[in-house]
From Swiss-Prot:
An annotated GO cellular component: cytoplasm
Location(s), subcellular: Cytoplasm
Catalytic activity entry: Hydrolyzes single-stranded DNA or mismatched double-stranded DNA and polynucleotides, releasing free uracil
Active-site residues, as the UniProt record annotates them: D64 (proton acceptor)
Family indicated by similarity: Belongs to the uracil-DNA glycosylase (UDG) superfamily. UNG family.
Encoding gene (name): ung
EC number: 3.2.2.27
Predominant localisation class: cytoplasm
Name of the protein in its database record: Uracil-DNA glycosylase
Pfam name, any one: UDG
Biological processes, Gene Ontology terms: base-excision repair, AP site formation via deaminated base removal
Length: 228
């Protein structure tokens, strides 16, 4: 792949597609009607802003954004500083404590430092109405995020996809396992984490796979931005 390829190059044309315009128009109309939609408009595409196509090493696929106040900011599983880690993220931390030597459970749930190291924190659906999980399913976001996965599949090699739960695993069916790595486990939600997410060791496995490709491993200890 030429290092100059960007998200704009490979999925920029999606913005011109009717399905994509319709999705954005629906979300804009809901906001105008006074509904609270998460994340804020400026944050919807943060995952792509923070992790450029040629920087992606790992993909962690989520479902739809958190639907509580001040949680979602465009990165799957991550919440804004000052907001307690939701239960699924709590289980991710629990797994990291046992999987990564020296990992300390943070007192926040802000995963931007992962994104800045090449972990694409991608939700399948990029918006949600406050308090209503899956309220923006089947609007068109799934088509867009399928194109994102297809672009990674085609234009990159050696990317590690962490697919947690049946939803993510279905979404990952198009990934060519001769070019990429797939790590599967149950979802980290409290309903399913004990069925094999806890103990999956995906984080250490990902770092081993990166090192085998002579790439820098991920520092999985989430860091808050330095206060200016």
């Amino acid at each position: 792949m030429s290092p100059s390829l960007t998200w704009h190059d490979v999925i920029g044309q999606e913005k011109e597609q009717p399905y994509f315009k319709d999705t954005l128009a629906y979300v804009a109309a809901e906001r105008r009607a006074g509904k609270t939609i998460y994340p804020p408009q400026k944050d919807i595409f943060n995952a792509f802003r923070l992790t450029e196509l040629d920087q992606v090493k790992v993909v962690i696929l989520g479902q739809d954004p958190y639907h509580g106040p001040n949680q979602a900011h465009g990165l799957s599983f991550s919440v804004l500083p000052g907001v307690p880690a939701p239960p699924s993220l709590g289980n991710i931390y629990k797994e990291l404590v046992t999987d990564i030597p020296g990992f300390q459970r943070p007192n926040h749930g802000f995963l931007q430092s992962w994104a800045e190291q090449g972990v694409l924190l991608l939700n399948t659906v990029l918006t949600v109405e406050a308090g209503k999980a899956h309220s923006h399913a089947n609007l068109g976001w799934e088509t867009f995020t399928d194109r994102v996965i297809a672009a990674l599949n085609e234009h990159r090699e050696g990317v590690i996809f962490m697919l947690w739960g049946s939803h993510a695993q279905k979404k990952g069916r198009i990934i060519n396992t001769e070019r990429h790595y797939i790590l599967k486990a149950p979802h980290p939600s409290p309903l399913s984490a004990h069925r094999g997410f806890l103990g999956c060791k995906h984080f250490s496995q990902a770092n081993q796979l990166l090192q085998q490709q002579n790439q820098q491993p991920i520092d999985w200890q989430p860091k808050l931005p330095a206060v200016e």
